[in-house]
């Protein structure tokens, strides 16, 4: 699947319902007040940015449940997760993670650079996800001509532990529901797309 990994959904930025999740981090009421103000100001700045003719959609998640917030956004596939704590605020920076990269791959970036580069970052993510999907498709597509070749390809070599053929087969079809039912019964193969 091209829009998911072991951690959850991976949404291309152009189709994501929201683009950025801001997660303020604080330990006291005093920190909360200043970090929340910084976070809300950053959210307003980001919402003024246009991404492919629509304003950026920004979520502020101020739940006080630590790492659960981050994993919630990873599973939901939000393109960019941003953590903001007192140190980030003092340095006028943010701690950013991209959903197209491993979840531990996070970087500190200045607030101004982040706001200025967010459309570029999202476009780079869009391109990376498309190229990854295209490479998967090309690397997992086999062309099959003829019924015998089709059955040979999908018949398990070892019926005790049948191999999984994940991917795509470009094959001819006789346009008969009976033919499709027979292939499904014999090989557990189903038609996904008919041009």
Regions of interest found by a model, annotated:
Residues 1-195:
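NTP/phosphate- and nucleic-acid-binding module
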């Amino acid at each position: 699947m091209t829009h998911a990994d072991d951690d959850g959904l991976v949404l291309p930025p152009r189709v994501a319902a929201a683009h950025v999740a801001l997660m303020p981090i604080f330990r006291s009421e005093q920190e909360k007040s200043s970090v929340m103000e910084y976070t809300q100001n950053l959210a307003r700045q980001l919402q003024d940015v246009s991404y492919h003719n629509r304003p950026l959609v920004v979520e502020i998640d101020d739940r006080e449940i630590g790492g659960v917030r981050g994993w919630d956004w990873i599973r939901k596939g939000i393109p960019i997760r941003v953590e903001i704590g007192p140190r980030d605020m003092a340095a006028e920076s943010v701690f950013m993670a991209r959903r197209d990269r491993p979840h531990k791959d996070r970087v500190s970036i200045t607030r101004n650079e982040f706001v200025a580069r967010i459309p570029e970052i999202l476009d780079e993510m869009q391109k990376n996800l498309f190229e990854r999907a295209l490479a998967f498709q090309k690397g997992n597509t086999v062309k099959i001509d003829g019924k015998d070749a089709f059955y040979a390809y999908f018949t398990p070599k070892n019926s005790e532990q049948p191999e999984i053929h994940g991917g795509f087969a470009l094959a001819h079809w006789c346009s008969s529901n009976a033919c499709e039912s027979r292939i499904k019964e014999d090989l557990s193969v189903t038609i996904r797309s008919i041009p």
